[in-house]
Amino acid sequence: MGIQSTGIGSNLDVNSLITKLMQVESQPLTALAKKEASYQAKLTAYGTLSGALSSFQSSLSSLNNLSSFQNLTAASSDTSVLSATTSSSASPGSYNINVTKLAQAQIISSAGQAATNTPIGSGTSSTISIQFGTISGGSLSSGVYSGATFTQDATQALAEITIDSSNNTLQGIRDAINAANKGVTASIVGDGNPTNPYHLVLSSSKTGTTSSLNINVTGDATLQSLLNYNPAGTQNLTEITTGQNAALTVNGIAITSTSNSVTGAIQGATISLSKVGTSALSLSNNTSGVQASVNAFAKAFNDLQNTLKTLTGYDATTKKGSILQGDATAVGLQNQIRGILNTAVNGLGGGLTTLSTIGLSIQKDGTLAVDASKLSTALSTKFSDVAGLFATAGKASDSLINFSGSSTATKQGSYGVNISAIASQGSLTGDLDITSGSIVIASNTQIKFTVDSAVATVSIAAGSYTSSQFAALLQSTVNGNATLSAAGAKIAASVTGSGFLKLTSDTYGSTSNVSLEDVSGTSLSSFAGTVTTGTPGTNVTGTINGQAATGSGQILTGSSGTNAEGLSLLINGGATGDRGSIYFSRGYASQLNTFLATAISSSGSISSSKDAINQNLKSLDKEKQTLNSRLYDVEARYRAQFTALDRIISNLNNTSAFLTQQLSALNNSNQ
């Protein structure tokens, strides 16, 4: 304490007396310190519990994710020839594959130039337009085609690169093409020629016959003479490598692919070709991976139980309970987890509804035991149903209906699906027959396209086109527009049986539409007739479990307030009427993950309990401050009292000494 004194006049040990008195007075402070230590210990215990719950939640990630069950294991007998990956739509199977050709990209080269940094042409702003398509017919000699035709691939966007005085060197052209990242790679190769050694080499970024190049330069004449390349006409570049498709057989069936990543040959699998040769390919369920995940789940659960036992248990030997013994939060969490594991799930209609059906059982001590043989059998015979036992999953009886998602409100169960209208795409169909003659597009022709909600003004390359060529040009040009691409807006262009131009949005639903507006150059009336506004698409409509559902594009979602609330289904076409059932399961890993995420969140039960303790600690701190202030005053009072006592005793001692002296003097005078 702050006040110090000793019994000078009384010879009393004042400090010792006050210390002993204050020890008695401070007993409430000692009690508060013990209570504070208890609260701090609980905070530490809650931190340990939260960490254990978080570790348990981490063990659920692979089981909670449906893709862990859907992606098959692909094994190639010769990985130097091919390898494969799978998606959720793949099925187990075995395949013999013979690769006879690898896909390759077309490569063309310019005439040699004396230097790489010397300006080419006048520097007038020019545009390099690159189409991608197929070269057919004719013959190829010394890198030049004769009598060939070029058919544009409408699915590949037109590439346009601007060249002006800032980049009209060989290096500048190379860098501009590469920076555009529009499907062509440029490089400069020197052949050692003493006069003109440097060649601009252009390679299609995609392999296959449909990605050959057709290059047209508008603007500077020198650039035109260097780069114009039409396999069906003028060719100022020579072909070094011909675009080629991959060729292979899968179980004896001939397959061609524009890419060495072959899709579609085996449903749900992508085959990556590396060299010519043969290999067996096996697709199988990832049973070993899932079994390892289940074992990891069981171990993590048992680790959590051991932590809970340590935190909430009672030691009969010491007759002491753990820090969280009887704690409502800890016991409540433990009971809720056990409740989830002891409750059957509906599953996906395959008969697996409890953990015990796949060999997992709760023991008397609360731990989870795994029957490896029973688990292995379940994974081998009912793999997809095991997925429904753990993950959030949906399985439709109709192959054209896919489970798309759910919400926390979606109830487990089987729901009937009835479709009253299939979703459609927005489209614009002209009323002018464009097949009877050529379509001539003037220079500086621009059209404003509105695709869905995206709007952009698009320049159409000048030229004379057949109806199919023009449709391909429009599709590639629109889909190559940066503004529309950024918005995810795409179209498909075609010519109807009546010869009309048809533009169809890539999306479905009421927001899907296409409209056109003249800006400059050739009028829309030259190829679309009088039609400039398309017909919007429509949303899917129908019911889930007999109750009206909400349609958005091809997605049908269960309405609020129903058992199917939030259940989303992708309706990939098909007929109207009853479409079978969708089985929805919220598996154990899914339920536990949702529960644990809430439990350890900032608004969960552990955080609430910790907040309450922290509030108690704040209250304790205030009590300590008040008590310390009172003790300070008590000690000061004791010291004041002892000081006064000391003075009195000192005065009495002085009086006693005086009287003693006087009596002694009196006695001496009487002698």
What are these regions (language model features)?
Residues T660-Q671:
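Short, charged, intrinsically disordered terminal tails
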